[in-house]
Amino acid sequence: MPDRYAVMGNPIAHSKSPQIHTAFAQQTGQALTYTGLQVEAGKLAEAITAFQQQEGKGLNITIPLKAEAWRLVDQCSPQAQRAKAVNTILLEKNGALLGDNTDGVGLVRDLINNHGGRITGQQVLLLGAGGAASGVIEALLKEHPSHLIIVNRTPAKAIELAARFSPFGAITGGGYELLENNSFHLIINATASSLQGELPPLPRGILRSGGWVYDMMYGNEPTIFMKWGQTHGAARSLDGLGMLVEQAAEAFFIWRKVRPKSAPIIAQLRREMDIKNPAMPL
């Protein structure tokens, strides 16, 4: 019997994780199945118990369940503990749940390895202070940007995140007023605004000459945030598809101790992207 894996979230129909992990399994010669399971907020513990009873081996967790997963696991990696968000669970034979967060690794690998980007010494702006943001802050700071600024419509959330991650580097959090008279080499959108076709309130001149923009959402067409970057002189306007594949590759390694090649899967997904879904979350 192949080992069983799944991704849990709501909504889940859009998820490309089953396709990605099936491709990884074929590429590496691993015998496993991977499915998408819709789970409502507040029902994750029940869903995980049912999956364990079916001898499941591991789970990915997507929106809106990452914080709930963090509260449920028996043990988690230091980065997941600090992020207070879990996107990968290893189900031990004794029933223990081991949690991790691979989002930060996925973002940094996509930016640096796949696109030749640079974080070290750069002024970096992170938009949003939810689970998508908290999962990537530590990985960004470990690349030693000159300064990381987090802004959020509710400033207190960004301030709390900055305080939590201050041991890892120069970081400031607050409201969008922090952006006045400031400019950045790299702007990362960790909000869900692209899903609604909306833009965060960014002032003119916020992107430095030659700067990059990165939207954690992805789609067949450029997201509205990527288009904003293109019209404001971005040297590169990138979406989060590569991050999705890279965080999945890290999760696959945690489960199977085999590291798949991500580039062929990213290229395959680009070819197959459904035009009916212009923006999708990780």
Curated annotation (Swiss-Prot):
Residue positions binding NADP(+): 128-132, 152-157, 216, 240
Positions bound to shikimate: 15-17, 62, 87, 103, 218
Superkingdom of source: Bacteria
Key words of the record: Amino-acid biosynthesis, Aromatic amino acid biosynthesis, NADP, Oxidoreductase
GO cellular component, one term: cytosol
Alphabetized GO MF terms: NADP binding; shikimate 3-dehydrogenase (NADP+) activity
Reaction(s) catalysed by this chain's protein: shikimate + NADP(+) = 3-dehydroshikimate + NADPH + H(+)
Source organism (scientific name): Nitrosococcus oceani (strain ATCC 19707 / BCRC 17464 / JCM 30415 / NCIMB 11848 / C-107)
Record family assignment: Belongs to the shikimate dehydrogenase family.
Annotated function: Involved in the biosynthesis of the chorismate, which leads to the biosynthesis of aromatic amino acids. Catalyzes the reversible NADPH linked reduction of 3-dehydroshikimate (DHSA) to yield shikimate (SA).
Catalytic-site annotation from UniProt: 66
SUPFAM superfamilies: Aminoacid dehydrogenase-like, N-terminal domain, NAD(P)-binding Rossmann-fold domains
This protein's pathway: Metabolic intermediate biosynthesis; chorismate biosynthesis; chorismate from D-erythrose 4-phosphate and phosphoenolpyruvate: step 4/7
HAMAP family, per database record: Shikimate_DH_AroE
Gene this chain is encoded by: aroE
GO biological process, one term: aromatic amino acid family biosynthetic process
InterPro entries: Aminoacid_DH-like_N_sf, NAD(P)-bd_dom_sf, SDH_C, Shikimate_DH, Shikimate_DH-bd_N, Shikimate_DH_fam, Shikm_DH/Glu-tRNA_Rdtase
Pfam families xrefs: SDH_C, Shikimate_DH, Shikimate_dh_N
Keyword NADP among UniProt keywords: yes
Protein's name in the database: Shikimate dehydrogenase (NADP(+))
Subunit structure: Homodimer.
